[in-house]
UniProtKB/Swiss-Prot annotation:
Catalysed reactions, as listed in the record: adenosine(2503) in 23S rRNA + 2 reduced [2Fe-2S]-[ferredoxin] + 2 S-adenosyl-L-methionine = 2-methyladenosine(2503) in 23S rRNA + 5'-deoxyadenosine + L-methionine + 2 oxidized [2Fe-2S]-[ferredoxin] + S-adenosyl-L-homocysteine; adenosine(37) in tRNA + 2 reduced [2Fe-2S]-[ferredoxin] + 2 S-adenosyl-L-methionine = 2-methyladenosine(37) in tRNA + 5'-deoxyadenosine + L-methionine + 2 oxidized [2Fe-2S]-[ferredoxin] + S-adenosyl-L-homocysteine
Taxonomy of the source species: Bacteria, Pseudomonadati, Campylobacterota, Epsilonproteobacteria, Campylobacterales
Chief location of this protein within or outside the cell: cytoplasm
Organism of derivation: Helicobacter hepaticus (strain ATCC 51449 / 3B1)
Protein name per UniProt: Dual-specificity RNA methyltransferase RlmN
Family under the similarity heading: Belongs to the radical SAM superfamily. RlmN family.
Sequence positions that bind S-adenosyl-L-methionine: G177, E178, S209, S232, L233, H234, N308
Amino acid sequence: MNIDFPFQQPSLYGYKLNELKSILSPAFRAKQIYHWLYHRYENDAMRMDNISKTMQNYIREHFALSQIYPIRVEHSIDGSKKYLFETYDGHCFESVLIQMRDKKLGHKGEVVESEKWTMCLSSQIGCKVGCAFCFTAKGGFVRNLHASEIVEQVVIMKKDNQMAPHKRVNIVYMGMGEPLDNIENVTRAIEILSESEGLSISARRQTISTSGIAPKIKQLGKLNLGVQLAISLHAVDDKLRSQLIPMNKAYNISDILTEVRAFPIDTRKKVMFEYLMIKGVNDDLKSAKKLLQLLNGIKAKVNLILFNPHEGSTFKRPEINDVRAFADFLIKRGLLCTIRESRGIDISAACGQLREKVKAENVSCETLT
């Protein structure tokens, strides 16, 4: 069992159930504790009232529970929420909860409305990749988040929104950081979150988004977790992509697509290619044609994202008519393509807007306790 804990005491959120069973006696206590952590969202051992005082004291003495603390949540007019977390060592990072509502016809012809939740998790404090369009990159890199800190983001957001333990949510590793630069902790978090006795969030409902570290895509594929893959492509030639994403100089488009073609994907799923559209940079039909050629033979879905303005950037948001023309070009030629509806722009929670810096802004926010 190789668990990297930076704390004086290891966090219970960093253990898989079988690992906890191997260190607690009797072993059934592990299942009880898992139930308290992930079904009751309890983070105080002394309130776990179906375990003995001896076990409560043992947990308190040998383990930590909360290692990240929600210090603020901002509410968007579209229902999204941005959470600001502080870590045990005094750093801050952000995650986003996205609420979407679906309407469909019921079996009697009535309109049925349902809500869907997506949690956009951070994997690092800051980021090393340095994408030219991303606000996170402006703050530099601080450190990796540990598996327990990734898992606890989900627990806190579920608890704060009074979600049932097995309420279906989608997880996207698209917050702060490059997930494959922290692959050990991210994949451990995926396994913990998918534990059937815990939150039971299937790996098929979890998506790792990467800027394209080709060897790590290969490593992830060999683990065969069943997780979904998203590639932050954003350009169709290496010259432009290297300007937007400096890592492209190490792992170019061809390197990335070679590993994508070999990546194990559920027969019902597709690899998502994220394409950030920037006015006058990559939003023309010539780029659409090249993108179509690049993805030929790949089970692909293209997600077009409109650039979200942020402090210090000279890039501009594209015209919606250009975005629609780009999408129509791909769709008419058989490539599945969607235009992402940006969520949380008013609270700087949209794609590319997250950053560690705590800003004194006049926004609707509350302190969590």
